[in-house]
Amino acid sequence: RQPLRILEVGGGTGGTTAWLLPELNGVPALEYHFTDISALFTRRAQQKFADYDFVKYSELDLEKEAQSQGFQAQSYDLIVAANVIHATRHIGRTLDNLRPLLKPGGRLLMREITQPMRLFDFVFGPLVLPLQDLDAREGELFLTTAQWQQQ
């Protein structure tokens, strides 16, 4: 039997991971791959989740092709992306970088803020990388549900 293969992208401090791993613990034939752009976050996650022997850890830059970073096409059943895709320069290209990693019938599970948050944009907007898809974002950092569906 093939293992269920899950890829978490932009895992950061492990908030979503900490919620998911206890639920997945004990699932037979499971591989969970925690990734983040930062080696610091991947090292911290490795320490934090050391009790889960079905987890492996790697760096992954979502803005680059995953295959050029050592990831195989059509190798994951599920990709988990919690509040990370919006933080990339070009959402469409980021999604294009993730799609090839999914097995046929695989799914992308995203959690993103979908309501405009002008105060958040005002405070944190200057800290965000220069965005290249301002037309798609319509001047906001976060996309609405309808805008995500167009991606």
Task: Please provide the spans of the model-predicted regions.
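4′-phosphopantetheine-dependent carrier domains
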Residues: R1-Q151
